[in-house]
Amino acid sequence: MKEKIGIVDTLEERKPYITRKQEKGQEIPLGCDNNSLAGAISQRACVYSGARVVLNPVTDAVHLVHGPIGCAGYTWDIRGAKSSGIETNRTSFSTDMKEIDVVFGGEKKLSNAIDELVEVYHPPVILVYSTCIVGIIGDDLESVCKTASQKHTIHVTPVKSEGFNGNKSDGYKAACDALKRLIKRPSEDEIKKKAPRVPETIKPKINILGDFNVAGDVWLVNPLFEQMGIEVIVSMTGDSTPKAISRAAEADLNLVQCSGSMTYLPKWMQAEYGIPYLNASFFGIEDISLALRRTADYFGSEEIKKRAEQILETEINRIMPEISRVREKVKGKKAAIYMGGPAKALTLIKGFDELGMEVVIIGTQTGKKEDYEQISYSVRDGTVIVDDANPLELAELLIRQKADLMVAGVKERFIAYKLGIAFCDFNHDRVVEFEGFDGFVNFAREVDASISSPVWKAVRQRI
């Protein structure tokens, strides 16, 4: 029998991507930010999928995939994002490229598809996604979209997301490049007015970037800022419209939640328009409190600071009895976290700590060295940290680390279920809000319900 060496039995080339927590100040010996190893069955997605997952929540845009029908089907309604108005984004459109289009080109087919969509749906924006085939045969997406924009006098925006041209992170950048085209440039005088100290007589304005309104999350966050006297211009891209996105440059500050998917946009807006940004999270008591206080401190208004503290005192006192009740039931349980990006992973560590639970496995698909160092400092001794894990590695880690609960996305759900381990979907497929104060109560209840379910008594707990 083959002897198992290391943290998990895996391919030799994969071992550098799995390690344990390091002491603060020590460099984490973890491989990351590389292309997936061939044959390792990565959970990552392609460039196109990364772009689509960011842009899909733009509610009244038409999302047209220039490529085979499978690409459009794979990402249909991918975010689970809710809309307060029109839901054009929930219909997926494709040019359905065939072999003949590969031979003779698909530009004419794309142009005809755009004409038909404008006639039927009258959208303010059409987002046209390129796929692997488009990159290979060389269709001029830019030219077709420019001609269509002039013909129909609407934004027809190319999203340069050829799937083979990188990984999911490159898709995030392609999405941000597309969003740049939708933002209306303010006058130079307005740009010069941007300042960190906003007079109390003026209502400050912010954008929330990297929040996709999954299950309605944004609707629990925006009211908190409105109560502070701060206007939220747009949440990108959750429940957003092209009209709201066009106003993004009017903001005094950008709050960035999912830094992995949106980091390019706030950096560009800071360089281009002088709008600063702060990283923020709206999950868990500690991170919500930090987000409100840092925003209030930035604007420097004593009235805004006072309102922030009043909100925190009221809301924390309101939810603590329920959080304490759940904490008594789940205290000491072990959790495994596997997320697409590091921002969610880091905020979940704090959330589980507030519930008295221990994180024993944590991994992401797109984390960078600095992200994993921060993760390493935030978890307890013995915690396994993994980059770009495959299903077999995750399954063995869940067994070895004796996890009671796995928090991940839909692709990892069945790994946990097959092992008889409780599961909580933190990503696209959930139907309950997890952000804001009520959202954290929802999360705590779902964790409790999953761990405490009697079904686990009827299945084999360990292999």
Swiss-Prot record:
One of its GO terms (biological process) is nitrogen fixation. PROSITE patterns: NITROGENASE_1_1, NITROGENASE_1_2. Keywords: Nitrogen fixation. Pathway: Cofactor biosynthesis; Fe-Mo cofactor biosynthesis. It comes from the Archaea. One of its GO terms (molecular function) is nitrogenase activity. SUPFAM superfamilies: Helical backbone' metal receptor. The keyword Transmembrane does not apply. Pfam families: Oxidored_nitro. PANTHER family: NITROGENASE IRON-MOLYBDENUM COFACTOR BIOSYNTHESIS PROTEIN NIFE. Belongs to the NifD/NifK/NifE/NifN family. NCBIfam families: nifE (TIGR01283). This protein may play a role in the biosynthesis of the prosthetic group of nitrogenase (FeMo cofactor). This is Nitrogenase iron-molybdenum cofactor biosynthesis protein NifE. The gene is nifE2.
